[in-house]
């Protein structure tokens, strides 16, 4: 019984082990086919790497401009609006907001070209508006860096032009408002002067009718329109001549308005150097390209070539076995 059991045990074979060994033997015998497949795959991969467009990404980080960068713009706004001028912090937020909007519009335009270009802008930190990360994907490292800097400058120039136009429009409107205010105050002052002369002339008429030639009162500060004739005709005639030649009397507001108008006239918007952003990090020169990845491509080529070669070998052997049966 013990011998028979040993024979039975010796005749038990593991089918999976036999199949694996047979599989490895088949692959070894067909190694030349596999090697050729790998070589062909590598050659195709090298060809792909030679013709594929490279992608390099240059990145920059920007934020709102410094106070010094918008000093001229802030001064112009203060001259135009006076006490109603926006705060510097509000101007900074407005400028970077306009830059971001203009940059996004440019990115959309580039993406819709016949040959799309990838330009992006997004917050550097999630859930925070600033700073902003801008990037450009080019076919060379130097080209990506140069293009990104060019597009940033292009957007900044565009925002600058828009701001200058807005300033010129606001200056024209502010100048008109100040000129209208001056004319109104001058008309009022002239009317007050004319009214004063008429009042004195009326008092002179009463004085003549009452034959009052000399002053009848001592305290002139107590004189009213009804008692002015008591100053006497001689004094009233002298007052009329004096009032006629005396310049118009204006309030301090009139002279402040003239000063504001002079300040606006002295504004030279064309000389303003306005920047809507500030670099936190200038456009980088990428050292690693995004695609194609040489190492990954070649590794995949070897794996794919090996799999195809193994498939050919196993398929060919399976076909031979089928025909032999």
Swiss-Prot record:
Annotated compartments: Cell inner membrane
Cytoplasmic topological segments: 1-31, 316-325
Main function: Confers a modal distribution of chain length on the O-antigen component of lipopolysaccharide (LPS). Gives rise to a reduced number of short chain molecules and increases in numbers of longer molecules, with a modal value of 13 (in strain O111/M92) and of 17 (in strain K12).
Pfam name, any one: Wzz
Name recorded for this polypeptide: Chain length determinant protein
Organismal lineage: Bacteria, Pseudomonadati, Pseudomonadota, Gammaproteobacteria, Enterobacterales
Family to which the UniProt record says this protein belongs: Belongs to the WzzB/Cld/Rol family.
Any one of the GO BP annotations: lipopolysaccharide biosynthetic process
Main localization of the protein described in the UniProt heading: membrane
Transmembrane segments: 32-52, 295-315
Mode of membrane association: Multi-pass membrane protein
Pathway annotation from the record: Bacterial outer membrane biogenesis; lipopolysaccharide biosynthesis
GO molecular function annotation: protein tyrosine kinase activity
